[in-house]
């Protein structure tokens, strides 16, 4: 094997050397083209397979942009070819988007229903072709309905009868659909989605009418009985209208409350009721107005109105005058035949007279305005009633304290004056856009509120505070009295103790004097007196104290003062 490869290489080298430059260039070009072909083939085969959304190219740019925009809303990536063919990633996505486009009337009018459903036409016998068409329609419509997000499963039966000889004997095409919604689906109560399934069937089967389509759910409830939905739609419309009226009433209520509560306070403005009548029926109004013609405009520099306005302007005027004089002659019929001239004119025949006739014709031009409008809704009569409480003032005595009688504070009610009520009524009328032509009604009343429970709570709180203040005052007075008694007792005790100590000191001093006198007398008499150790120490201590008092009188005075303060 190796020798053969070696010989092959030698032969190729030898042959390559023998070739001319042109032959070498041709070989290199062929090899390059082959490599490029392989690369293009691999790239093309690696691309994902796209499924056409509609087999018919869409040339209308506006319709194509609407379809692309709807696909983008569903997060579906689509490509558009140069001829206008829209493609998506897979068949399942294509079926789901076809259903959405059919439901929302985004399929172009010139698109063949067969192109939408991608049903092939079979060119065999008529019987086989009809069977294949029916089977293809059933399968395709079933797949499209299953592709919907709200549908778990579906069964479709379409009956296409044989062609009859006479149109009166021709039976209609019928279709029955059984859908099995998903557990969280609301398709059974959404009319728009059911209508989308009906459009799907009508596009799939030419000649199929709405009255011949029956769509039921797993409970055998007919879903496309739109006549039965009329009552529900009417109730839903009434509910929306009532919500609209309630929202408008809430806006007016907030406006009126904000206006009055800023003046009288939140607690004095209550019982606000607003009723707005609104005609929500759709009406077409046509109005023709004949307006005067302004010949000269008003000069803004003058303080008065110098404009000139006329009802009309003469555009064409014609005057004709006829004068006739002579014998009147009424022609009869042929000779021997009585004429058909009335008797009144016969009496005027063959008379001589003078007749003048003047005819004036004028064509007046007027200004005309025509207005055609659809009026809905129309705000009707507005009724507002609000109650404003007067002012309650607490009575005080000459000392500025509240007057309390039988456990309650006496109060005085001051009503709102009639002039102030008129001003408040005018303010409310301006706030709601009062119109006497609509027979609007605004009532601002001054009815005294029942504040019994409120006053009871307020009086109870006031009396409780007063009682607490009295208790605190008496407690403080009691504490002050106790402290005063204690201080008096302390002063008296100190005074008694001081006097007792003075008596003891005086007694000791007298005893000391008597003892010293006895010693002195004994010394004078020459007697030998012996002293005890305690007496000797007391004498030494007294001498030391006396000596210190003589040497340091200030220190001794400070020491005595400290003893007195401690006592």
UniProtKB/Swiss-Prot annotation:
Protein's cellular compartments: Cell inner membrane; Bacterial flagellum basal body
GO MF annotations in UniProt: cytoskeletal motor activity
Gene Ontology terms describing biological process: bacterial-type flagellum-dependent cell motility
Protein name per its UniProtKB record: Flagellar M-ring protein
InterPro entries: AMP-bd_C_sf, Flag_M-ring_C, FlgMring_FliF, FliF_N_dom, YscJ/FliF
Keyword list, A-Z: Bacterial flagellum, Cell inner membrane, Cell membrane, Membrane, Transmembrane, Transmembrane helix
Family as reported in the entry's similarity comment: Belongs to the FliF family.
PANTHER family: FLAGELLAR M-RING PROTEIN (PTHR30046:SF0)
Keyword Membrane attached: yes
